Structure formats: C-alpha cells, structure tokens
Amino acid sequence: EGVLYPGTEIRDFMRAADLTHISNEVSFYEGCPFPNPDYSGFIFCSDPSYIDLLDDLGADIIELTGNHNNDVRALYKVDSVPFTLDLYREHNMQWYAGGVNVTDAKKPLLIESNGNKLAFLGCNSYGPEMAWATADSSGSAPCEDLGWIADEVTRLRGEGYLPIVTFQ
C-alpha cells in the first residue's frame, strides 16, 4: 500500500512532537532487493526511497545503535553506512550512536530545543562484532566497558546538557 502506509496510524502523533527520535535498525542501499517473504535469513537493508517514510513521520533524530546497520557489508561487500549518513544529512536528520568509524560513532549528538540542552549518546552491546564501528570501519558505537559513556555523561552534564543514553 505504499512506503508511507506503515506510518498511517502514528503520523499525526509523531509529527506533533518537538523532536522525533527513531531508531533505524538498517542502512539504506541502492541495490537493496525487494523483500522476499521466503527468505529465512536476518540480513536487512532499505531501499533509499523508504526514507520518505521517515520524512513523513517528521523524524529529526536517528538512533544507530542497531545491529543490522552493517548487513549490506556482510552480504554484498559494500559499506552502505556513508551513503546512509549522506541520505540523513540530505533530509535534515541528525544521528548518533553510529558513524563512519568508532570516533564518529561515539560522538554525542548535541541539540538545543525550547531552552533545553540535550545530548544523545548510545551504543550496541548485542553485536555481533561486525555490527560495531572500528578505527577503520563504519557501524554502531560498541558499548565495550561503558566507561566512555560514563565519562561523556559526566562531561556533558558539566556543560549543562541533559544526557539521553540508549542501548541495544
């Protein structure tokens, strides 16, 4: 029934928010095949046209803690994360907890809205390891020992931010 159909019942609710946060579990990939109902695996991607649903819902903030953001790399040997981040940027969406490398993935998303200073941080503890960003590859921020998150929360609170931390 079209790419916007899944948002039919929640559209007005989502659009009414000052900030709309969505956890998007998968990367966009231009070669993403149409879903096959007989496929029994757990390798996921989204056709770039599906960004229209996030636009329609008014998505502002995209969480990338998901463990399927690197599925395209595992199956097709293509790193689709940079393309995905460019697509978010083109659609004026900001993201956190994922990036082109581990430094980028661990960077907090800082937003000031209605007089509030918000800092979004997140990480993936679930894995598998191929889902995690490294010094040389894209993916979700690995939780590791959580010390880095504790340090960031302390630093950000000292700067007047309210940290919002998400985990998968």
Where are these regions (language model features)?
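Acidic, metal/ion-coordinating pockets
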Residues: 1-168
